[in-house]
Amino acid sequence: FITCTPLNKAELIKIVPFLLNRTSKEQASEFSVSFYAMNGDKAIRYVYSVLLETTHIVRETLIYYLSQQPATVFERSMENNVSSIKFGQKVKISTAAKEEITLKCLPNMSVFAAYMQVNTNIAEMETALQYLTKQMMPAIVPTSSLSRYAEEAIKKETAKEYILRYLQEADFNISNISSKEQETKKGVVNYTMYQHKVSSGLGGNDYYEFPELYESDGTIRTFGLASQIQNSIGSNAFLAVDEIESSLH
């Protein structure tokens, strides 16, 4: 949505409202994300918010915090079925650029999408746009396959340490995870082995290794989820997880 440019102002916005009551589908949907982006050696907090219906954007704002008080980058609303955009006092932008962005901003597109079509540079918008387009990871849903990425992640020692710690804190008795290769007629196949630590009953511990086939869905799901969370932290990225409890113990 952020960078999507519709063919015309009649094109519908692809949103699905909450449907489990009688009123929500008749109301506008709202989305807001708060994030930190670097400005030199200082992390600046930004908040992007949008209120929209399938036909048009009702309200859209971008604010940031250079101090404890928020400052406006832009504020967009609808006036007589036409987009109206106001830029903050601290934003450096020419009158001509303001007018061009407003003219290009159809009712069913974001201010960012209109901005990207104009030959101008607004530092605050560039910073926010970079984060929203480069550091918003694909959402994880119950049908998302996470194992392949996790199998690659554990080849890196730092990622492996984090994933193991995550699994252990989730009360799994997994003491090690290793990625292995096997030659087959179809080529090299990668697979993951899980090492479990079990009390021997004699004051010591026994260790058993099992392939993924013998692990529960909860273990596999947590393994994949841990790798994605580690990636989001390392990349300072935003990660949305739908039904996080799905298949977890």
Residue ranges and their predicted role:
Residues 33-41, 64, 196-203:
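Short acidic, glycine-rich loop/turn motifs
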Residues 28-30, 82, 187-191:
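A generic structural signal for beta-strand entry/edge sites
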Residues 27-28, 171-173, 234-235:
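Short, well-ordered loop/turn elements at secondary-structure boundaries
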Residues 41-183:
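Electropositive, glycine-dotted interaction segments
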Residues 186-249:
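Conserved ABC ATPase signature
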Residues 1-54:
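Conserved P-loop NTP-binding catalytic core
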Residues 25-27, 42, 159, 221, ...:
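Short, glycine/acidic-rich beta->alpha junctions
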Residues 17-21, 180-185:
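Short, solvent-exposed loop/turn elements at beta->coil junctions and helix N-caps
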